[in-house]
Amino acid sequence: MTNEIRLGEYNLLRVKEVARREGFGEIFGLYMDGGREGEILMPQKYVPEGAKPGDEIMCFVYLDQEERPIATTEKPLAKVGDFAYLECSWVNEYGAFLNWGLTKDLFCPFREQKKRMEIGDHYVVYVHIDEESYRIVASAKVERFLKDDAAKAGLKRNQEVDILIWQKTDLGFKAIVNNQYPGLIYQNQIYKYVHTGDRMKAYVSNVRPDGKLDLTLQPIGMAAAEDFSAVLLQYLKNNNGYCVLGDKSSPEDIKHQFQVSKKVFKKALGDLYKNCLVRIAEDGIYLNAET
């Protein structure tokens, strides 16, 4: 069990006692042992079935409408320290409120918005604790929270990473890498449909001197061809041993069908051909009968 409550994060808390309404005996939740924070209420609607004093429960702690710590077993879409793509639920004279999967929406003050947020639109934001108010808030000015020391972190060329697509630019798409670093996928490296807010795997193609990362959506070089060889072989098996595309097909047709570059397609096709798994003809590719 944790001794210090981490607001906006998951905490393993012990059930101290059942919360009863004074004078009525009505149960309205559990009081969790918050250590130095004192008792933290878990409302009855979040209490796991059969929970009793002495049990330990993994719960998310945030502030309720009256700014009191509250424990829940709900799973938020993001926690403090995370970048996330969230929908604006409503706005008032102080800022916008984003749906992050909890009963109380996440506040994004006007000063943390790049442009005025509108109801129904989605935004990439960073979730953090406001130092002045000690409230959990969101910021759309995500650049302030990204690190520029990817090289020191040991990220290397062709390393697989997790990315969140952040913003479209003239060069391609900006991405947040491993929830920490800025990255860029150049337009000529994109071989499938990509949208702001998408989460996917990517590969480091270059670690730049400024600490930013160039990315690609496929493994580099032979690794990409080897991965796609298996995809192409399975496609042939699933389509009566035939593919209308070949080494003379246009990059656009290959991209549309398989979401890879023509270079990767040709390398994979060559690998299958050298291993006598396929036959290349004028009208396409044929799976060898014994395959």
Residues covered by each model-derived region:
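Single-stranded RNA-binding regions, centering on S1/OB-family and related RNA-binding modules
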Residues: 1-291
